[in-house]
Design a protein with these regions (language model features):
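Short, small-residue-biased leader/transition segments that mark boundaries at the very start
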Residues: 2-6
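Acidic, glycine-rich active-site loops and adjacent beta-strand->loop/helix elements
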Residues: 7-13, 33-34, 107-109
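A short linear-motif detector with a strong N-terminal bias
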Residues: 7-9, 26-28, 80-84
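Glycine-rich, charged/polar anion/phosphate-binding loops
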Residues: 10-18, 85-89
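Short acidic, glycine/serine/threonine-rich loops at helix termini
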Residues: 15-18, 39-41, 114-115
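A glycine-rich helix N-cap at a beta->alpha junction
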Residues: 19-38, 102
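Active-site loop ensemble at the mouth of alpha/beta enzyme cores that anchors a bound cofactor
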Residues: 38-48
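Active-site-adjacent substrate-binding region
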Residues: 47-133
């Protein structure tokens, strides 16, 4: 059975870590997609993170997300974020043994005056719907 966990804290090592069911099999973190130098994502796309500063995301999750985007003609970019960590990473660090992934709308200026485009938000929602179908 699927479970939803919603949290409002950001990258602080609790929330999803503390409230995920013991038998969780997959974690999909929905955050922001990075936009900037050396990255493929724009502020009009959904970003699928392949790897971040904690290591690679689960191959089958990333592959499934990319395939769902392709099959549904969703504008996406697959990127590596070398200086980033997600709530899914924090959950794995806390000992949760689950497949994990990270997606989000492309966003400029993280932790500043963040800017994105409604197309990126729509693409993120469409990817969520397609992947979870």
């Amino acid at each position: 059975a699927a479970s939803d966990v919603y949290k409002r804290q950001e990258e602080v090592g609790h929330g999803a870590c503390a409230s995920a069911p013991e038998d969780v099999e997959e974690l999909l973190s929905v955050d922001m997609g990075c936009v900037g130098e050396g990255l493929e994502c724009t502020d009009r796309q959904v970003s699928i993170c392949v790897k971040d500063g904690h290591g690679p995301y689960h191959y089958d999750v990333v592959k499934g997300l990319i395939q769902a985007a392709k099959d549904n003609h969703i504008d996406y970019a697959a990127d590596v974020y070398p200086y980033y960590g997600s709530d899914a990473d924090a959950a794995l660090s806390a000992g949760i043994d689950a497949r994990h992934g990270l997606i989000g709308p492309g966003v400029y200026a993280s932790h500043g005056y963040e800017r994105s485009h409604k197309d990126a938000v729509a693409a993120t929602l469409e990817l969520l719907k397609a992947y979870l179908a």
